[in-house]
Design a protein with these regions (language model features):
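Structural beta-strand/beta-sheet cores of well-ordered domains, especially the beta-sheet scaffolds
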Residues: 30-32, 65, 83-85, 100-104, ...
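Conserved catalytic-core segments centered on acid/base and nucleophilic motifs
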Residues: 59-61, 65-81, 85-88, 132, ...
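C-terminal helix-coil-helix/basic helical segment that borders enzyme active sites and/or dimer interfaces
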Residues: 223-240
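Gly/Pro-rich turn-and-neighbor structural signature
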Residues: 3-70
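Alpha-helical scaffold segments in carbohydrate-active enzymes
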Residues: 20, 24-27, 31, 176, ...
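A generic local secondary-structure boundary/capping motif
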Residues: 21-23, 56-59, 73-77, 91-95, ...
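Glycine-rich beta->alpha junctions and the first turn(s) of the following alpha-helix
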Residues: 125-219
Length: 240
């Protein structure tokens, strides 16, 4: 969506690059992590106002072969066990912040990419079997240490006015997918609450029933919002 909008505005070739990237991605059946949240530093300051300019991932140089990027992204889910890292801006950007307007994709084991992992794992089950709760998960800090990115893997480079658009395009799609899974999670939570209330002998109490009804309403509204967003959606210039 956004690469096509950048191309329409600047005559670049980002969209076709991304299409070719996706073709290869699908052919090889790869898995990617979205690498978006920057370290940020002082939240009261913009990227160009930070004491350390590398608190947001930025382009430090470019040549005919590609770009060199530096900085870190935080709390990246599954970075340690994905095939590809797809890097996106994390916020809106101003004209002074062109060097931070960058998007690209690279293999997770790319040269000069450092993944500092934080792993978590569920405790061993002693009494009740829980097959779906036997696997842990991880998130990581991803550090780009003057990392070279070839042009065919660069999807934004300096087009600052599209930084926020690209950040929100990912976030909005992410939230829309959650409209399907989060109501289901809430159903499980409500079931646990209802069962607990029954064991405690308070399932018929008004304040318990009221809170369960409120949760049910929230779950249904989220699900309905997801359907409405899909039905009422419009096509972007890319055809998406």
């Amino acid at each position: 969506i956004v690469t096509k909008e950048i191309d329409d505005a600047h005559g670049t070739e980002y969209c076709q690059r991304f299409v070719e990237y996706i073709k290869n991605y699908q052919k090889k059946d790869l898995i990617a992590a979205a690498v978006q949240t920057d370290a940020k530093g002082d939240r009261s300051k913009r990227p160009h106002e930070q004491v350390d300019p590398d608190l947001y991932v930025r382009v430090v140089s470019k040549n005919k072969d590609g770009i060199i990027v530096r900085g870190a992204k935080e709390d990246i889910t599954m970075a340690s066990y994905c095939d590809e890292l797809i890097v996106l801006p994390t916020r809106t950007l101003t004209a002074e912040e062109k060097q931070w307007a960058v998007a690209f994709a690279i293999p997770a084991d790319w040269d000069k990419v450092h993944i500092i992992n934080h792993a978590s794992a569920p405790r061993e089950r002693k009494f009740l079997k829980a097959p779906l709760n036997t696997h842990g998960s991880s998130d990581a800090m991803v550090v780009f240490d003057d990392t070279f990115i070839p042009w065919d893997r660069v999807f934004m480079c300096g087009e600052h006015e599209f930084g926020g658009r690209m950040a929100l395009a990912f976030a909005t799609s992410h939230r829309h997918s959650y409209c399907g899974c989060k109501p289901a999670v809430e159903d499980i939570i409500m079931g646990l609450i209802a069962l607990t209330a029954e064991y405690y002998g308070v399932a018929d109490k008004h304040h318990i029933r009221e809170k369960l009804a409120h949760l049910a309403g929230i779950a249904e509204l989220i699900y309905a919002a997801g359907i409405a967003a899909a039905v009422e959606s419009t096509k972007a210039s890319s055809g998406t």
